[in-house]
Amino acid sequence: MTNIQLVIKDDSNSITLNVNRDTLCSKIDYFNKMFNNFAESTKEIVSIYVLNAQIVRDLIDSKIYDREITADKKNWKYILDLYKCQDYFGIEIDSELMKDLLVPREYFGHLIDVIDLIGYNKHTVNTVVQNIPIDFNVKVFPPKLINKMVPVITDSIKVFGSKTSIDIVCLKTREIIYSLPTIGSLCNCFCYVKNKKMVFFINELSQLVAFDIRYGTSNIISLRIKKEDFNTNPYYRKNILLTDVLYRRNSDLQIIPTVNILYNKISNQLIFCHNHKHVVIIDVESYRVINMYTHSNYFDVNIDNICRYVNHNTLAINHSSNIIALWNLESYEIHTRPKPNGIINLTALIYYNTYIYKNKFQKIFVNEFYLPNKPFELKPKHSGEITFVGCSPDNKYIVIVVDYCQITIFDMEYTLSLYASCKCVSRTYIRYEYPLSIIFGSNNTMSILFETNKKNIVHVYSLKSKKSLKNYV
């Protein structure tokens, strides 16, 4: 075999290559079959008609010279036609270029045709989810594709409290999947249990609801403490005040969460405050009330909020009086600690004995329950109204947001002295109105929901790099 001229033609272009026939046959099986079984085997000039002449030239060069084809993600049509050409010539397809590819809405069908050629893998399924038009009927997809899409969609879900609803947002498709109506004052009283794909919230009728994201179904949870339950639950009988409350009412106690709802992954339990008087623990599987905490001065003292340290079974209960109660969720032992002067809001537990609080002068402090240390003030870089204080899941970062989402991040390095190693590491200004909701991710990210010009905008912000990673509309 000798050198030949290969003429590559498409509808608008023609490219001629001088190639060695032996090399071409050894690199691409399509040409091996052509030059050994068909009339082209004796020709010195061979013409082929293809979808895109330039892409086929790139393919041939990449195989002959062992070069990788690269393409800008913006050149989506080149990438899709490249895959079609690879399929036509029987060249093994690498779906790496499909990763995070975005195509215009009107070419979504073209994208699906190409993915059918490639097959369903992590890159192609992610790309389908990212490009689905909002009004597209996914029921036309093959069941195999739908089954692979479900975990991709659910894994990219964030749940935010907006003005009158709990919004379930898919960051892959950039849309609100479900909007669950609630009471405005309880729009942030919800709990997203990611491993179960469940959202627990209070609806507009003041009912506790379990919403299954996978199936879009709701289950109203009716929680009642009955007198006869005291015969089977020893924890109830220990709660003398609760017993007294029940018998004074001479009726069952209807349980409705208020303030905030927490999830204890260790024991698979929900924890919340009822009517600002009781802290209730329920089993997530059976929705059975397991235990309740009631302050000794039931009629005069309210429970303002509760906080839990994720890596330790300890719950901090912030009372309207001058104490904070620490409730061990394994032994159910209770220890009380006096509040520092002026505390109005217990914000977070960053260790089993260390907490963040806000005082009546809108100042943020870190303090320890068991050591006589002076509270350490966290001073944000901006002045104004503090709209959010929170701690990342790994307790490494404390975030304070002032006014129009001016963010100050504190790095908490736990060495011998907590306060000597607490320092401000960054500040960022994002030009939007007050954030509607802020939630932390498990990978040191923070998702911030804004409303501007009647549109919801989600910023995903990296606590590690101190940068906005992505914006979703």
UniProtKB/Swiss-Prot annotation:
UniProt-listed CDD domains: BTB_POZ_ZBTB_KLHL-like
Domain spans labelled BTB: 2-72
SUPFAM superfamilies reported in the protein's UniProt record: Quinoprotein alcohol dehydrogenase-like
Gene3D superfamilies attached to this UniProt entry: Potassium Channel Kv1.1, Chain A, YVTN repeat-like/Quinoprotein amine dehydrogenase
Domain of life: Viruses
Family: Belongs to the mimivirus BTB/WD family.
Protein name according to UniProt: Putative BTB/POZ domain-containing protein R765
